[in-house]
Amino acid sequence: WLMKATTVTVAFGIVVILGTVVGFGLTGGMSNGSELTATWTSDTGRQVSANHHAVAVADGSVYAPISDDRDGSCALISMGVADGETRWTYDIPPENCTIHAVADPTVADIDGDGRAEVLAATTEKEVAVFDAPSGDIETRLELSDYGYTQPIVADFAPATGREIIAVDVTGTVFVFGSDGETLWTARLDEYVWAQPAVEDFDGDDNPELLVGGRSGDAVLFGPDGRVEWNTTVSEMGSITWGTYGQADEDPALEGIFATTSGSVVGVDGRSGAVEWRTTVGEFAAVRAFGDGDGDGAPEVYVSAQDGRVHALDAATGEIEWTTEVVVDRVQMMPPPNLGDLDGDGSTELLAAGNDGSVTVLDPATGDILSSYARDVQIFTHATIADSDDDRADEAYVIYADGRVVRLEYERPN
């Protein structure tokens, strides 16, 4: 079942490049002929407008966390990437059906048998592990509260095989073995809304777990649960989004955090020292990290409640450009994504707006290339993946009403 696709253009935007302001108006289509169009819209609509957990895309399927309001229609739904048709559904019990019923899912082969699993934290206070093709439950991993963030599958702890790492909403860290055994836990005693990450942050050839919390503190855990550092990232706002990458020439990675007060903060992965701090506006959000302009130095791409998207130098936090993609007053803005949307070997920036718009930008300049919209809010970032092996990434966006839209971008040669 498909809804009619709509392609729109942005009525007005402002680009600020190194202090220069450029205004432009767009009417009746993009002058470059590029188009962002919907190939399907899923039949997973709900009566509430509060869905805000992103989908996962892997192996020909989209896994959509669908929330509602205690009417029994909360679910994790598997659908085909080609047509959005439902393949299987896991229903959350009505008493657990809330706007946080199912958090962002993860797809991974946990046990190495060549068959993927889907993992999702739920309001049943567990991480549910499903056989990806069939939707059958393989195991349930108990949490102390519901999970808000995406489970991580990584070779992390000093144990055989890969581990499952989950941080529930009240800040308890769980590390499970691939057999479901709890290896260790730790309590942060604060809410965690930003996505945790496992990587070798300090450059010692061993992975660590980085977690940011409501208090504005970030904590780096070693694989045995030992705290390696604890840093105050913000005294004025909660950490709600984060990303990471190699921003400079030292071996350690940098953690990049965005806060409700509007700060974007770069933190050294070895020591936890704050390397830079930039203010972009309230409810800052960050996810994309990469060399979007091809100059050999990475950028981080940030949004804020005022509807603007910013490119920041990842090493210094200096703002390289700013573009307004949403003109109307909105509640928040999801963070933008990087991906090769047209298959030409270079990346584009995709910004989902809380007003229901999805905008493609040139990551080097901030120029708006194309846009799509539904008259429904968006509360989370898109998921970008080349799901049909055509060398071009597709974007999957979940709207607040629970419908998932697959978007494709075409740009003339």
Question: Predicted segments — roles?
Answer:
Residues 1-413:
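Hydrophobic alpha-helical segments
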